[in-house]
């Protein structure tokens, strides 16, 4: 039994499925699990597996794929068989052409992956049923969650980038007269009242299940107070409209919840100081969902209690409440999604802006080189699960890699370059495909001349020991003679087959290069790797490319000759 070949198969599969790095324990487990007769020889074979894993991890992803195709083509056939169309489950009470969904972001910050779940689900279901998708800006809190003009624009742009085109855009702040009309109707019906209790006093009564003294006063008195709220006779905090509910409800927050309150000098970006009575979220949302004909709502599990509050209004007016689908929170491991934390970080100078690549905003993911299709696929894969889901960056990277791999041209980027002088090598022009699977895209030409050094990365110093043989990728094989501030090497041969047979490591290189910086998000830090990019690399801003043996990057900007890229993933 060829242990080495079995280990190579599993190491390659593990590496390909996990960002280019095989996990030793996982490979050992696979080898011994598939071949239990090898267990008694574990001590003997683990060093063999370890050596194979190290070799596999030193290969570029393209080389790993090529090698696996050679030794185990069945893997790719099985992957094709396993592929099935992933989609969303059917919606309850949904009729073709009659489904209306909405996404209601607050324009007080850029929206993030967690918010994108509701947006994508709402849009995809409306599309699935040939219905209507509404973007409703929930912008009626000019005090605590203050809307800003820039975020209205950002949200529309981010939705467009995700491929989401609203059939209608609604601004809640344009609809205050509508909310006033319904508030007055509820007061006249005896289902709402104006409370002028100090907040602490009301809270004390509410928690004991005792009605506020204003609750059962005559409708005429309530309407008089309502007019005073509107005309400015009450100041901020002095009066609030409450919806009558069950004073014995187990959740005190549901008991006579506040529907409208006064905000003096709101200075709202759309309405200025025209209005001083503003609806709270549950009131405005309940009214709009009915008025706009919304049939299905996708809402985070943490907001489930909103439905309990809003149903009182629907019951009083005799309306049918939309079908509500609750889903869990979605987050990325180790990535900040909270708008308040992001805003604070930006204000303190910790983050560079709403598109800082360390963040989980849609803008940040876009800047980092994540494709909209990857985000959509991830959301649909997670679907309507009620439990919270924490996605690892590796999960998102795996989906994105599958999408960018066919489109990303390949280039050499040498981080922390050190010169290597090669003795005895002839002048040679290496012709390297821009993409190994797409010869029609052409080649890059890298010229080697004996009188000039090549540059290799300090990351590869562990491979460049005197006496070692390595292959300069797509160029030739060399023997390492001396390592210091520069490396001395001797030309050995051109043939790739010799390097393959002897399992010599592959090293990427450049001759003349243009300056390049790669910004790498690492937790709370941004690490900058400086180096050299192929001199004639024809890269453009926003292009996603693969720096071979380094990873996929998005070209962020070009300053003169210098290229600045942001690291996406392996």
UniProtKB/Swiss-Prot annotation:
Its EC number is 6.1.1.17. A motif ('HIGH' region) lies at residues 105-115. GO terms for cellular component: cytosol. Its main location: cytoplasm. Keywords: Aminoacyl-tRNA synthetase, ATP-binding, Cytoplasm, Ligase, Nucleotide-binding, Protein biosynthesis. Signal peptide: none annotated. It catalyses: tRNA(Glu) + L-glutamate + ATP = L-glutamyl-tRNA(Glu) + AMP + diphosphate. It holds the Pfam family tRNA-synt_1c. It is found in: Cytoplasm. GO terms for biological process: amide biosynthetic process; glutamyl-tRNA aminoacylation. GO terms for molecular function: ATP binding; glutamate-tRNA ligase activity. Belongs to the class-I aminoacyl-tRNA synthetase family. Glutamate--tRNA ligase type 2 subfamily. HAMAP family: Glu_tRNA_synth_type2. NCBIfam families: gltX_arch (TIGR00463), PRK04156.1 (NF003169). Catalyzes the attachment of glutamate to tRNA(Glu) in a two-step reaction: glutamate is first activated by ATP to form Glu-AMP and then transferred to the acceptor end of tRNA(Glu). This is Glutamate--tRNA ligase.
